Amino acid sequence: MRHRKSGRQLNRNSSHRQAMFRNMAGSLVRHEIIKTTLPKAKELRRVVEPLITLAKTDSVANRRLAFARTRDNEIVAKLFNELGPRFASRAGGYTRILKCGFRAGDNAPMAYIELVDRSASEAEAAAE
């Protein structure tokens, strides 16, 4: 029985899941919007939201924690230099999930996951 076991398995073993969400979190921080399946988007929230909360208070210890979770210095720099200050006044809820139909090959439900306070120029670039 899987009572009280949180998180989705997504038909992957734990190391594959960890690597996938590490890559997806990096892509979301870098591009501020990504398209993925709905279950992956919902699970990605649980990875990205704590990273942004961590980035709101800039310290060496927090930067090292963020690096341990992302393994990418470019992502850590963007988290602490751009996203942390941008979301300083927001108490959680940094991401938005928008459903966008079904994938052509296997009819999987697809969704965009984006950071809520994206600038208008980035939104226009993503739409193109």
From Swiss-Prot:
Pfam families per the UniProt record, alphabetical: Ribosomal_L17
Keywords on record: Ribonucleoprotein, Ribosomal protein
GO molecular function, one term: structural constituent of ribosome
InterPro entries: Ribosomal_bL17 (IPR000456), Ribosomal_bL17_CS (IPR047859), Ribosomal_bL17_sf (IPR036373)
Any single GO CC term annotated in Swiss-Prot or TrEMBL for this entry: cytosolic large ribosomal subunit
Biological processes annotated in GO: translation
Superkingdom to which the source organism belongs: Bacteria
Cited NCBIfam families: L17
Family: Belongs to the bacterial ribosomal protein bL17 family.
Subunit structure: Part of the 50S ribosomal subunit. Contacts protein L32.
Name of this chain's protein: Large ribosomal subunit protein bL17
The species this protein was found in: Edwardsiella ictaluri (strain 93-146)
